[in-house]
Regions:
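Terminal low-complexity/charged segments
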Residues: 1-182
Protein backbone atom coordinates (compact mmCIF):
# COMPACT_ATOMS: atom_id res chain seq x y z
CA UNK A 1 0.00 0.00 0.00
CA UNK A 2 1.47 3.36 -0.96
CA UNK A 3 1.76 6.41 1.25
CA UNK A 4 -1.31 8.16 -0.18
CA UNK A 5 -3.48 5.08 0.36
CA UNK A 6 -2.34 4.77 3.99
CA UNK A 7 -3.03 8.46 4.57
CA UNK A 8 -6.51 8.04 3.05
CA UNK A 9 -7.23 5.01 5.24
CA UNK A 10 -6.12 6.97 8.33
CA UNK A 11 -8.39 9.88 7.46
CA UNK A 12 -11.32 7.54 6.81
CA UNK A 13 -10.79 5.46 9.98
CA UNK A 14 -10.13 8.44 12.26
CA UNK A 15 -12.23 11.33 10.91
CA UNK A 16 -11.67 14.83 12.21
CA UNK A 17 -7.96 14.39 12.89
CA UNK A 18 -5.74 16.45 10.60
CA UNK A 19 -3.01 14.02 9.52
CA UNK A 20 -0.12 15.73 7.78
CA UNK A 21 1.90 13.63 5.34
CA UNK A 22 5.64 13.84 5.96
CA UNK A 23 8.40 13.17 3.48
CA UNK A 24 9.90 9.70 3.82
CA UNK A 25 13.15 8.37 2.42
CA UNK A 26 12.22 4.74 2.98
CA UNK A 27 9.19 2.57 2.26
CA UNK A 28 7.31 3.49 5.45
CA UNK A 29 4.48 5.98 5.32
CA UNK A 30 5.14 8.87 7.69
CA UNK A 31 2.54 11.26 9.10
CA UNK A 32 2.55 14.03 11.65
CA UNK A 33 -0.06 13.97 14.41
CA UNK A 34 -0.55 16.86 16.81
CA UNK A 35 0.30 16.34 20.45
CA UNK A 36 -3.31 17.07 21.40
CA UNK A 37 -4.66 14.40 19.01
CA UNK A 38 -2.28 11.62 20.10
CA UNK A 39 -4.47 10.33 23.00
CA UNK A 40 -7.41 9.71 20.63
CA UNK A 41 -5.36 8.59 17.62
CA UNK A 42 -3.23 5.95 19.37
CA UNK A 43 -6.08 3.63 20.46
CA UNK A 44 -7.74 3.98 17.05
CA UNK A 45 -4.49 3.02 15.31
CA UNK A 46 -4.39 -0.16 17.37
CA UNK A 47 -8.11 -1.04 17.50
CA UNK A 48 -9.62 0.01 14.16
CA UNK A 49 -9.87 -3.10 11.94
CA UNK A 50 -8.73 -1.19 8.83
CA UNK A 51 -5.55 -0.14 10.64
CA UNK A 52 -4.73 -2.77 13.32
CA UNK A 53 -1.30 -1.43 14.28
CA UNK A 54 -0.88 -3.89 17.13
CA UNK A 55 2.87 -3.50 17.64
CA UNK A 56 4.91 -0.49 18.64
CA UNK A 57 8.27 -1.46 17.12
CA UNK A 58 10.21 1.71 17.87
CA UNK A 59 9.81 4.90 19.88
CA UNK A 60 12.51 7.54 19.85
CA UNK A 61 13.01 11.27 19.61
CA UNK A 62 15.00 13.75 17.56
CA UNK A 63 16.39 17.08 18.74
CA UNK A 64 16.08 19.53 15.85
CA UNK A 65 17.63 22.48 17.67
CA UNK A 66 17.63 25.41 16.86
CA UNK A 67 14.36 24.77 15.02
CA UNK A 68 11.03 25.13 16.85
CA UNK A 69 9.25 23.00 17.74
CA UNK A 70 12.55 21.61 18.86
CA UNK A 71 11.70 17.92 19.27
CA UNK A 72 9.97 15.21 17.31
CA UNK A 73 8.85 12.03 19.05
CA UNK A 74 8.75 9.20 16.53
CA UNK A 75 6.62 6.06 16.80
CA UNK A 76 7.04 3.16 14.35
CA UNK A 77 3.97 0.92 14.30
CA UNK A 78 3.44 -2.47 12.66
CA UNK A 79 0.20 -4.02 11.44
CA UNK A 80 0.61 -7.77 11.05
CA UNK A 81 -2.91 -8.11 9.67
CA UNK A 82 -2.31 -5.63 6.84
CA UNK A 83 1.45 -6.27 6.56
CA UNK A 84 2.54 -2.64 6.74
CA UNK A 85 4.39 -0.14 8.88
CA UNK A 86 3.52 3.40 9.81
CA UNK A 87 5.74 6.09 11.26
CA UNK A 88 3.95 8.67 13.41
CA UNK A 89 5.77 11.88 14.33
CA UNK A 90 4.65 14.27 17.05
CA UNK A 91 6.19 17.74 17.30
CA UNK A 92 7.04 18.83 20.85
CA UNK A 93 8.13 22.38 21.78
CA UNK A 94 11.16 22.79 24.04
CA UNK A 95 9.36 25.14 26.45
CA UNK A 96 6.63 22.54 27.09
CA UNK A 97 8.39 19.22 26.46
CA UNK A 98 5.74 16.66 27.35
CA UNK A 99 3.03 14.50 25.78
CA UNK A 100 0.68 11.74 26.87
CA UNK A 101 1.97 8.23 27.41
CA UNK A 102 0.93 5.44 25.05
CA UNK A 103 2.18 2.71 27.39
CA UNK A 104 -1.38 1.56 28.18
CA UNK A 105 -2.05 1.10 24.46
CA UNK A 106 1.30 -0.45 23.52
CA UNK A 107 3.09 -1.87 26.60
CA UNK A 108 6.40 -1.77 24.72
CA UNK A 109 6.29 2.02 25.11
CA UNK A 110 6.94 1.75 28.85
CA UNK A 111 10.72 1.55 28.78
CA UNK A 112 11.07 3.40 25.48
CA UNK A 113 9.29 6.45 26.91
CA UNK A 114 11.56 6.27 29.95
CA UNK A 115 14.57 6.24 27.62
CA UNK A 116 13.30 9.31 25.74
CA UNK A 117 12.66 11.08 29.06
CA UNK A 118 16.11 10.16 30.35
CA UNK A 119 18.06 11.19 27.27
CA UNK A 120 15.99 14.07 25.81
CA UNK A 121 13.96 15.37 28.77
CA UNK A 122 10.58 14.86 27.10
CA UNK A 123 8.10 13.87 29.82
CA UNK A 124 5.24 11.44 29.24
CA UNK A 125 2.14 12.41 31.21
CA UNK A 126 0.47 9.46 32.93
CA UNK A 127 3.49 7.17 32.62
CA UNK A 128 3.36 4.42 35.29
CA UNK A 129 7.09 4.59 36.16
CA UNK A 130 8.78 7.86 35.16
CA UNK A 131 12.16 7.11 36.77
CA UNK A 132 15.44 7.45 34.91
CA UNK A 133 16.36 4.36 32.94
CA UNK A 134 19.94 4.76 31.71
CA UNK A 135 21.51 7.70 33.51
CA UNK A 136 22.29 7.81 37.24
CA UNK A 137 19.58 9.39 39.42
CA UNK A 138 21.85 12.35 40.24
CA UNK A 139 22.64 13.09 36.57
CA UNK A 140 21.95 16.69 35.62
CA UNK A 141 20.52 17.43 32.20
CA UNK A 142 19.69 15.28 29.21
CA UNK A 143 22.69 13.99 27.25
CA UNK A 144 21.11 13.66 23.77
CA UNK A 145 19.96 17.26 23.63
CA UNK A 146 22.11 19.17 21.19
CA UNK A 147 22.77 21.89 23.75
CA UNK A 148 23.89 19.41 26.41
CA UNK A 149 27.38 20.34 27.59
CA UNK A 150 30.09 17.92 26.65
CA UNK A 151 32.28 17.64 29.70
CA UNK A 152 34.42 15.15 31.53
CA UNK A 153 33.69 15.12 35.24
CA UNK A 154 36.77 13.12 36.20
CA UNK A 155 40.07 12.66 34.43
CA UNK A 156 40.16 9.61 32.19
CA UNK A 157 42.15 6.62 33.39
CA UNK A 158 45.14 5.96 31.17
CA UNK A 159 46.98 2.69 31.60
CA UNK A 160 50.73 3.04 31.82
CA UNK A 161 53.02 0.82 29.81
CA UNK A 162 54.36 -2.14 31.74
CA UNK A 163 58.10 -1.90 32.37
CA UNK A 164 59.67 -5.36 32.16
CA UNK A 165 63.37 -6.17 31.87
CA UNK A 166 64.60 -8.87 29.49
CA UNK A 167 65.49 -11.10 32.44
CA UNK A 168 61.97 -10.81 33.92
CA UNK A 169 60.41 -11.49 30.55
CA UNK A 170 62.59 -14.58 29.97
CA UNK A 171 61.81 -15.86 33.48
CA UNK A 172 58.05 -15.45 32.87
CA UNK A 173 58.27 -17.26 29.53
CA UNK A 174 60.19 -20.14 31.15
CA UNK A 175 57.70 -20.32 34.03
CA UNK A 176 54.75 -20.43 31.60
CA UNK A 177 56.48 -23.14 29.52
CA UNK A 178 57.05 -25.30 32.59
CA UNK A 179 53.49 -24.76 33.83
CA UNK A 180 52.02 -25.94 30.51
CA UNK A 181 54.09 -29.15 30.61
CA UNK A 182 52.67 -29.97 34.00
Amino acid sequence: MDHDAILASLQQAIPGVPFEAAPSVDLHATVFVSRDDLPSVAPALRDHPDLAFALLAELTAADLWPREPRFEVIYVLVSFVHRRRLRIKVRVPAADAHLDTVSEIWPAANWLEREVWDLFGIAFDGHPDPRRLLMPEDWEGFPLRKDSPVQIRRPPHVAEALQVTEEEFAANVERDRLTRRG
